Structure formats: C-alpha cells, structure tokens
Amino acid sequence: MKFTLTGSGRMGQQVADVINRSGIHEIASILDDRSVVTAESFLGSDAIIDFTVRDAFLQNLPAMLQSGVPVVVGTTGWDDQIESVKRRVIESGSSLLYSANFSLGVNIFLRTVREAARLIAPFDQFDIAFTEHHHTGKADFPSGTALRAAEMILSVNPRKRTIVRELFDDRKITADELQVGALRLGSVFGKHTAYIDSEMDEIVISHNAKNREGFASGAVQTAKWLAARHTASPGFYTMDDFLNEMLA
C-alpha cells in the first residue's frame, strides 16, 4: 500500500518509521504545515493517515474527502464537530475512520473498563473515576482517549450521568458525576487508569504506553482495513467497527 501522511510531528514521524520498516508499504508523500493541500495532493495513495492538529485537520478535510482516498484520523480535539464531519463524509461517498487512540492495547483496555463499569452499575457501594497522564507537549486535556473512556462508562452505568473535568475551590463532586482527571508531566507517552472504589475494595485498571509505536502500528493496520472495505462500504468508522470485525 501507498500512504500519504498529513502531519510531520512526533506521531507522523512514528507512522512513517513503521511504514518504512514494514517492507511491504511505502510513503507516497508527507504533507506538513507548509504544504498547500488539494485533492490532487493525494493522487497515487491508497490511504491517508492524519496526525495534525484540530484546525489543520478541519481545513484539510474537504480536500481529503474530494480525493476519494480513505482517511484514517488520529488528530484529536475536534469532537464538537464530529456530527458535521460524519455528515460530510457520508455525503462525499468517501470513507473516514477516527480514533483518539489506535493502540490495540488501549482499545482492549477501554473495553475492559466498559465491562467493569457495567458490572458495578447495580451495586451502589462502588464508585468509579478516571485519570490520564501525558507528556507536557500534549495540547488537549483530558485526552481524547480519556473522554472516550468516560463516554463508554456513562453508556453502561446509569448512576453516572455527566463528566466533570475539573473541580474548583470547595466544590464537591456529586454521585451522578464522573470525574476525569488530567496530568501533564515529563515525557510520559500516555497512561490511563480507571479507579473503582468501595469501603471494602479498590479495583484499578490501567494501561501504560511504553512508546508511540503501538499507536502508529495500529493506525497503519486500521488504514489497511479501511482501504479494503472502502469501495464496497464507504462511510464513517471508528475503532469499535474495526475491532468488532476482527473479533467476530
């Protein structure tokens, strides 16, 4: 497969390294913040992998969709535009797969957290909270992965109804609120933890990324999957769609 990469930051460089070391894939082009992006920028590509920033992704989206090349997006921070993006993808007849985190380990972790949140739902003595820890260069907080985890918890645990990102002064959290804490420190690639607590027990479920290769490898793997189904089944996809098919 031939890939066009949009974004030449740390994740873009890691994806390029995975592709170059694969022995079977190649890079058609790399577009950075100095590139003028048009539909023609993606000619000769089998898939696009986007790791940029919110504004760049939204600005480049029309050209990517117009090109007809399937797009895998790891850029985060645009969740408020997700319904608009879904609509544009469907109207274009193209394909886009979005995930805040392409690590297979993280996605297995997320499903484990969701199942744990479902299991404790009938038992009032158990409470649940979530934290994430990333390097100081990460711009968005809480991370897209943490917010995805929070949404999954809320979807299966009716005792939690809203997400609280920060607590100020003497404000106390209420029983129906799910706290999602964020820490920016050092050079941590990414650590996500769910805490389940009662007066009698504590359950801790955690995922700690050792490097960025897991994210990059997952992005390449999902791009292959998306390209294979793009012609017959275009549309908007998530990591759940990929995993559901792989685990079927």
UniProtKB/Swiss-Prot annotation:
Keyword Cytoplasm assigned: yes
Gene Ontology molecular function, alphabetical: 4-hydroxy-tetrahydrodipicolinate reductase; NAD binding; NADP binding; oxidoreductase activity, acting on CH or CH2 groups, NAD or NADP as acceptor
Species this chain originates from: Chlorobium limicola (strain DSM 245 / NBRC 103803 / 6330)
Its job: Catalyzes the conversion of 4-hydroxy-tetrahydrodipicolinate (HTPA) to tetrahydrodipicolinate.
Keywords carried by this UniProt record: Amino-acid biosynthesis, Cytoplasm, Diaminopimelate biosynthesis, Lysine biosynthesis, NAD, NADP, Oxidoreductase
Binding residues annotated for NAD(+), in chain numbering: 32, 74-76, 99-102
Protein family according to the UniProt entry: Belongs to the DapB family.
GO biological process annotation, one example: lysine biosynthetic process via diaminopimelate
Compartments where located: Cytoplasm
Catalysis: reaction(s): (S)-2,3,4,5-tetrahydrodipicolinate + NAD(+) + H2O = (2S,4S)-4-hydroxy-2,3,4,5-tetrahydrodipicolinate + NADH + H(+); (S)-2,3,4,5-tetrahydrodipicolinate + NADP(+) + H2O = (2S,4S)-4-hydroxy-2,3,4,5-tetrahydrodipicolinate + NADPH + H(+)
Positions contributing to (S)-2,3,4,5-tetrahydrodipicolinate binding: 135, 144-145
E.C. designation(s): 1.17.1.8
Pfam family, one: DapB_C
Leading EC class: oxidoreductase
UniProt pathway: Amino-acid biosynthesis; L-lysine biosynthesis via DAP pathway; (S)-tetrahydrodipicolinate from L-aspartate: step 4/4
Active site residues according to the UniProt entry: 134, 138
Protein name as annotated: 4-hydroxy-tetrahydrodipicolinate reductase
GO cellular component, one term: cytosol
